[in-house]
Regions:
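C-terminal cap/substrate-recognition subdomain and adjoining C-terminal extension
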Residues: 186, 190-304
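Non-catalytic pre-domain segments flanking phosphatase-related domains
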Residues: 54-122, 285-293, 297-304
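Bacterial N-terminal signal peptides
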Residues: 41-50
Length: 304
């Protein structure tokens, strides 16, 4: 077949073949391509946003103001040594208190204490119970404390005992001393708190020994117990575990410490808590609604 003949016949053949091919809407393909490109763009934007959020969350975690304090509590060799040392001091002081009929730890204790059975009052969180796993959650996910997230943590019944706590409490009970626990936890957390104490096999004879915050202040609880017991020791990690008026300016809080200087390490046994407490909120006036940046700015101003 000659090339000229083929050239004349090709258009006709192409027309025949085209009759059997599906119709192609070029405009529709262009729109689909645009949609695909748009979808990929959106997907990439979402992916970038997620990765950015993850990076931001990780960066915020590594710069969270509680990171070093919580790390020290959980991983340092010094903290368990300090905790056991503090409980050992409490045991020695308990022996002295039992031998001295005039010994009392509560400022709320009035009148003659002769004949009253002995008791001690211990704060729970970060004195008896170790809640640092909750602080880890704050650092990694939450950003700051909230009553709801803390309640969720409490209901898991996963708090461990502070090193030395069980040995000291068993020692107190063996010497005929009643153990009372008071806490800033709410009444709605009574059942899970009770389960946690019993799970750790800590002395807990009945519900009257667990005193929770939304019924009375800690000072009122001390006054109530002082009517029926001679209070030998107070144990805690916050000033309000020992004395009223601690929710105050930092300078006032230090004045309270100085006023009762003879009681520290004797009737009053304090535990270190570098993670939270009234000390942390005092620089910004306990105004928890302030933006975090403003809270930090006011804390920075406190430094000398």
């Amino acid at each position: 077949m000659s090339s000229v003949f083929a050239a004349h016949r090709f258009p006709a053949r192409f027309a025949v073949w085209r009759a059997f091919l599906p119709r192609v809407d070029i405009r529709n393909h262009a729109e689909r391509a645009h949609d695909i490109r748009h979808g990929l763009s959106v997907t990439m934007l979402v992916l970038c946003a997620v990765l950015s959020a993850c990076t931001k969350s990780e960066n915020e975690s590594t710069t969270h103001e509680m990171l070093n304090a919580t790390l020290w509590r959980q991983s340092s060799a010094e903290y368990p040594a300090i905790a056991r040392q503090t409980y050992r001091l409490a045991s020695m002081n308990l022996d002295q208190a039992l031998a001295d009929p005039q010994w009392t730890a509560a400022l709320e204790q009035k009148g003659n204490t002769t004949g009253l059975p002995p008791a001690i009052i211990a704060d729970l969180d970060e004195t008896i119970l170790d809640d640092t796993s909750y602080e880890v959650r704050i650092i990694r996910w939450l950003g700051s404390y909230s009553p709801e997230s803390f309640a969720d943590w409490c209901r898991e019944v996963n708090a461990s005992a502070i090193p030395g706590a069980r040995e000291f409490l068993d020692y107190a009970v063996a010497h005929g001393v009643a153990v009372f626990y008071y806490s800033a936890r709410k009444e709605s957390l009574r059942e899970c708190t009770t389960r946690n104490l019993r799970h750790l096999q800590l002395p807990f004879p009945d519900e009257t020994r667990l005193l929770l915050a939304d019924r009375k202040s800690k000072s009122d609880y001390r006054a109530d117990i002082a009517e029926h017991y001679r209070i030998l020791l107070l144990l805690g990690d916050n000033m309000e575990d020992f004395v009223t008026g601690s929710r105050a300016d930092p300078s006032v809080r230090i004045q309270l410490t100085d006023r009762y200087i003879q009681r520290w390490g004797r009737e009053w046994i304090v535990f270190p808590n570098p993670m939270y407490g009234h000390w942390e909120a005092a620089p910004y006036g306990y105004d928890y609604q302030l933006p975090r940046t403003e809270q930090l700015r006011r804390k920075l101003r406190m430094l000398q």
